[in-house]
Amino acid sequence: MSAEPRVDPARPPDPKTAQLRAEKNPIKRLGKVLGPGLITGASDDDPSGIGTYAQAGAQFGFATLWVTLVMLPMMTAVQYICAKIGLVSGKGLAGVLREHHPRLLYPAVLALVVANTLNAGADIGAIAAAINLLVPVPAIVFIVPVSLFIIALQVFGSYHLIETVFKWLALALLAYLAAALFARPDVIKVMVGTLVPTIRLDPKYIGILVALLGTTISPYLFFWQASQEVEEQISIGRRHLRQRQGASHFELKYALWDTIAGMVFSEIVAYFIILATGATLFVAGKTDITSATDAAEALRPIAGDAAALLLAIGLIGAGVLAVPVLTGSAAYGVSEAFGWKSGLDTKPGRAPQFYIVIVAATLVGMALNFLGINPITALVLSAVLNGVIAGPLLILVMLVANDRSVLGERVNGRVLNVIGWVTTAVMCLGALGLIVTTLVGLSRSDARPREGVGRASERKEGWTRTPQRRSTEQ
């Protein structure tokens, strides 16, 4: 029996490969390579992730900068494996798991939908709060318009339009590099924090390490990247499964470079957020940062209006990019798990269930901003769900990546297997650490009920914070 996925002889050629081969300018070639990998990497730096990076810098200065270097190969390996599964099988990750490992798929997809919806709601609130930093209008006013804009982009925009918009939104994250320069960090201390790993047996420090790991290697990115590789194939005319199955050496090579570029971009942004907040908030003793908007507000009196403005702009771009990825990956997971037609390049009338999931997840996320739910509690729950399913999902991903009936000769090599399995082990251990630190954190918060209730009752906007009000409280 042949282990190689069958390839349709009528498979349309990939025009991108021919264009890349013909392009001599390395910069233009890189621009043409960038696609799902860049978008995936940029969407990883969503407002919730930015808040985690800001917390790391504010609480521990430069002591966690080294973590970004450690996470880069892990993140790159995992996302490239997911991209390869999509390219070679011609299906999204959930579609492959449905055929080969269905038992764990459905609870994983359920947890994914819940976690993504909570995360999307928090990100919508963060976008509105960031706009409020720029415009003197209550943040709650922007919740509905932002949500409807995101829905319209996904439902009515073509795949190419969405991809183009996402690429430009990714550039907004470069604002964090500029914000770090305004912070004027101590270069020697930065180099030490980057190159010398710091290990502390401090529950808070261990907790932030686990949080950094969990916000970087997230299950929704596994589903998104595999599905986007399939979308790319469909967009060049490979609409039938047999036309998409199999992938040439050059297609995999360019997918690898795209993934590397996206993950490097993601970790550079994370690095500079930690650097900027470490050089300002940590030095000034402002360690009580619970969100990205907190960080932007706190930066203003320390690093000036320009740094705070750049942080707010980056936050808006990150949120508008991340919310569609969160709701879209949930829709891909559900649709592929149940065998429904899916795809952002497919008209809503031909894939109604797919778009219903997108719209429902966005609207529920929007509604959470009006219910007075504590956003930090919701994000903790989202992080726990992601942490719990990441390890088991990675085990399944690694099994598929070594299954010749799925990938043929494109199964993982030794290097990918080593990095992939090490990452899987680390994520499983991280999940245990996340559960422990969450239980400890919740038990401590239960011991101080008045503070939690008071802060929640003061924010009638739900998940949306009004910075001016918060600063007067302080």
Regions found by a protein language model. Give the residues of each.
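Hydrophobic alpha-helical segments and their helix-loop junctions in multi-pass secondary transporters
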Residues: 171-199, 212-231, 396-405, 431-442
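Membrane-interface "cap" regions at the ends of multi-pass membrane proteins
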Residues: 1-48, 103, 232, 236-239, ...
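Helix-loop-helix module between adjacent transmembrane segments
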Residues: 41, 75-79, 104-123, 128-158, ...
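Extracellular loop-to-transmembrane helix junctions
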Residues: 28, 55-80, 94-99, 103-106, ...
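Extracellular/periplasmic helix-exit of transmembrane alpha-helices
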Residues: 74-88, 227-235, 264-294
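Flexible loop linkers connecting adjacent transmembrane helices
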Residues: 13-18, 52-55, 80-104, 129, ...
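Loop-to-transmembrane helix boundary motifs in multi-pass membrane proteins
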Residues: 103-105, 140-143, 306, 310, ...
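Transmembrane alpha-helical segments of multi-pass small-molecule transport proteins
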Residues: 106-110, 134-156, 172-181, 350-364, ...
